[in-house]
Amino acid sequence: MKLAIVPFFRELTWSQVRNLFHFAARRLTEERLPQVAGSLTFTTVLALVPILTIALAIFTTFPLFNTFRTSLEAYFVHNLMPKGIANTILGYLTQFSSKATRLSAFGAVALIVTAVAMMLMIDRVFNQIWRVKTKRPIVQRILVYWAIVTLGPLLIGASMTFTSYLFTATDGVVRGVPFVGAVFYTSISILLSMVAFTSLYIVVPNRLVEWRDAVVGGLLAAIAFEIVKRLFAAFVIKVPTYTVVYGAVAAFPIFLVWVYLGWLITLAGAVVTAALPIVKYERWWHVPQPGSAFVDAMALIAVLYEARASADSAVVDTKLLRDRTQLGFDESEALLEKMLDAGWVARLKSEGPKRMQWGKRITDGLDRWVLLANPEYLTLADVYRVFVFDAGGNEMLAKKVECAVEQGLYQSLANYFRESSEGDLPGQHLPVHQP
């Protein structure tokens, strides 16, 4: 039975939905994301004032955006923070950022460095979740995040200004039916959060993320954010323990806990977004075993060999390799890098920028591969030595193993694939054994 939340989302079976959350929970543990959320919380507290200072400078420089600033402050109070501490925290941050505008040039540089350090840490964490090996150039990363810091407040302020006009236009309707008003306002809050999360999941990782996956992860994160915000606000109001213990500064530890929960939700949504294509297309249950790299490498070479032997093109993109072998992008990249070092394959990169076509599936054409080695001379033993066992030294036992490998795997890849062509080529239809 297929599950389709909205027609343009991925269609998943109930079994795949269960697998998705099981795999996402495993990734959360493997990547130690609760601890990472703690590190991001500390970095956020340090960088929040510099980022707000930059935003305040933009609003001050352009008086036209003063309305946006008011809307942004209202969004911060009503949507981003639980009631009870929002006004207090906003007052402190506004006071700190106003004083920061009077800093010297050296102090301003220090603020900018702090903000950039936070952006780079977020970039590292997101690429770690997507298992990205190749990072963007440092200048490109700084420019991307600088654009987010400068344009983000304006876009949020503009959207909130539009939303306030919408609230005013529908005020009579929502006041007449309180339940409708509550649902309407909550839906708008979730929608704005979903757009923010979705944009984050698409822009930050140095990998093409299909927008359907980002929307699903963004929607789940936005719903979780709204639920946790309401529960946290109820806890702060009903259980005033922090106020009794900390007194006037009680808002600060509560704010730290809230920032931590916000980052935990953000990272969990990122894990779900990254896990969706893996559960849908790849063997998420696979645990590497001794010798499995040899089998996986042969599956990749089989696809490249078939493309080389075809009359069309010998070039194969990584998406086709994934579809034909069920190997993840990170798995296939590691294997292909070894083949690249051995001189068996070549990597071709597109000159154009990354692009995403809305309403269509993306094709990851940035990394394309072609088989260079002559399969008539490359043997199974060569592949085995690269991915499983290489004698290296002159030890007697190693030499015996080397001789056994040569005798048992002397066949050339071309002969092996020709014999296999009577059935399916390795990697064309791999057996799928899910747990």
From Swiss-Prot:
The entry's keywords: Cell inner membrane, Cell membrane, Membrane, Transmembrane, Transmembrane helix
CC annotations in GO: plasma membrane
Main location: membrane
Transmembrane residue ranges: 45-65, 103-123, 142-162, 177-197, 208-228, 252-272
Pfam families referenced in this protein's UniProt entry, alphabetically: Virul_fac_BrkB
Superkingdom of the source species: Bacteria
InterPro entries from the UniProt entry: UPF0761_bac, Virul_fac_BrkB
Coiled coil location: none
Signal peptide: none
Location of the protein in the cell: Cell inner membrane
Keyword Cell inner membrane carried by entry: yes
HAMAP family: UPF0761 (MF_00672)
Family: Belongs to the UPF0761 family.
Protein known as: UPF0761 membrane protein mma_2179
